[in-house]
């Protein structure tokens, strides 16, 4: 995740349902999202449940999602939750907390329905850590007939003990809107999209943006890059933004070498109108094969390009960590009772360092500009609590006083990565650096194998 804090000058410039008979029991989770019949800015979601052998079932909406490091309680945006048997009879449902519901007679459960409110139109727009807003790139937008930002963790829930069950997602949408995602649409209809995922965690890592068609695609080696843009006034188009982004991503791919194996990568760019009911949190959120980005539409093209270069490159480098190299806490992420990892210095710090290092390495910026950036990080880190253990802060980042120090992962975290890079280069006579270390860790673990938090430093020393 990369958050953008606008300068004071720029900030001043910006000013400021019907239920019928459902299908029979099944062994997957079949979700339908209706983007056609939007009522009062709410979307209906219907879920055909898998088979339960227990008397009760627990249905959950995430409290937190990977990459955000904050409790966002997406259940706050869900209402009118109902459960039904195969004949359409209501089953008793009890709200356990803001994110979870207990369903009685679960052996009869066939269907769950609920309404979803979006997050963009209620954001307060406070500074970093000053409000309870969902970070916009991790949020949701419902603008009937114009735009739907489907960060699926805000629309689709999961049943406890069924997290590993395959998901099928059907999205009914206006024919005037196109859904862009790294997922492949299995339905040829221009009014319905069908996607499948092996489990819940895989599904919610695949955001979709629906808007009037405005996208480009290009190949970088064997990887397809798709850029989709929503600009409410039409100020910017994907065609305008693509050349700059293509140059940057070719440089990233060259810097990474053989690291990235994904065949398709989607960049979903939402440009906010900055009206009171639009997104106010600027930056991006990473996923294994995509990035969601939110920026103010009022930005000039040159500034927008520079911001995109920094934030999108940061998110893309998350392919290295934590999407490839990560701990058990990341591998087995619990959306409602998360256990955080000690190693934000790596997940965010190394990533931020790479996002700057590749630019000088590939000739996108001069050496002096790179040194100036790192000097700024030294200055910014000096205003934080330098005596606080970075691993302890990471492990406890969801609560104070550690939470308020999170932003330091982009400052001190990047500096830790740079120091480690220098140390490795000195000891190897310049033959290795931190990129090689991450490659070695990837070979040791990879995306399917997690490390134990308390063993990482020993493994780094060994390598």
Task: Describe the predicted segments one by one.
Residues 326-334, 338-413:
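Acidic/His/Gly-enriched intrinsically disordered linker/tail segments
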Residues 50-86:
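N-terminal, post-signal-peptide region of Sec/Tat-exported proteins
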Residues 1-4:
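Positively charged n-region of N-terminal signal peptides that target proteins for export
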Residues 398-399, 403-410, 414-463:
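Amphipathic alpha-helical substructures
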Residues 15-16:
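C-terminal motif of bacterial Sec signal peptides marking the signal peptidase cleavage site
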Residues 23-64, 151:
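Early extracytoplasmic/domain-onset interaction patches
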Residues 71-80, 85-250, 254-262, 281-283:
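Non-catalytic architectural context of zinc metalloproteases
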């Amino acid at each position: 995740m990369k958050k953008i804090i606008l300068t004071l000058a720029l900030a001043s410039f910006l000013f400021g349902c019907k239920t019928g008979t459902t299908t029979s029991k099944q062994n997957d989770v079949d979700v339908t999202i209706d983007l056609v019949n939007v009522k009062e800015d709410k979307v209906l979601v219907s879920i055909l449940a898998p088979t339960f052998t227990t008397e009760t079932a627990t249905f959950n909406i995430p409290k937190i999602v990977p990459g955000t490091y904050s409790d966002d309680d997406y259940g706050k945006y869900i209402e009118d939750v109902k459960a039904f048997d195969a004949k359409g009879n209501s089953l008793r449902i009890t709200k356990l907390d803001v994110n979870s519901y207990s369903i009685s007679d679960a052996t009869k459960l066939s269907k769950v329905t609920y309404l979803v409110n979006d997050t963009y139109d209620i954001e307060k727009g406070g500074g970093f850590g000053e409000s309870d807003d969902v970070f916009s790139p991790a949020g949701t937008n419902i603008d009937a007939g114009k735009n739907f930002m489907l960060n699926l963790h805000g629309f689709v829930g999961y049943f406890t003990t069924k997290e590993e069950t395959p998901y099928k997602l059907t999205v009914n949408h206006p024919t005037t809107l196109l859904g862009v995602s790294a997922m492949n649409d299995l339905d040829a209809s221009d009014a319905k999209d069908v996607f499948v995922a092996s489990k819940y965690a895989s599904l919610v890592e695949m955001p979709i943006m629906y808007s009037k068609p405005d996208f480009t695609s290009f190949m970088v080696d064997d990887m397809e890059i798709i850029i989709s843009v929503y600009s409410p006034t039409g100020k910017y188009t994907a065609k305008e933004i693509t050349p700059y982004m293509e140059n940057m991503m070719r440089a990233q791919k060259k810097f990474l070498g053989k690291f990235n194996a994904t065949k398709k990568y989607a960049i979903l760019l939402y440009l906010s109108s900055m009206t009171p009911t639009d997104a106010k949190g600027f930056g991006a959120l990473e996923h294994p094969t995509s990035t969601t980005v939110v920026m103010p539409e009022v930005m000039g093209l040159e500034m927008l390009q520079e911001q995109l270069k920094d934030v999108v490159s940061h998110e893309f480098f998350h392919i290295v960590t934590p999407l490839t190299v990560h701990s058990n806490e990341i591998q087995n992420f619990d959306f409602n009772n998360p256990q955080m990892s000690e190693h934000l210095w790596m997940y965010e710090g190394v990533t931020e360092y790479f996002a700057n290092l590749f630019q000088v390495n590939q000739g996108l910026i001069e050496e002096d500009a790179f040194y100036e950036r790192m000097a700024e990080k030294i200055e910014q880190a000096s205003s934080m609590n330098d005596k606080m253990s970075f691993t302890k802060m990471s492990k406890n980042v969801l609560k104070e006083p550690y939470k308020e120090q999170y932003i330091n992962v982009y400052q001190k975290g990047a500096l830790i990565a740079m120091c480690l890079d220098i140390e490795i280069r000195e000891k190897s006579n310049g033959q290795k650096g931190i990129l090689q270390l991450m490659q070695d860790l990837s070979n040791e673990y990879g995306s399917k194998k997690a490390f134990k938090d308390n063993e990482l430093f020993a493994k780094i020393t060994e390598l």
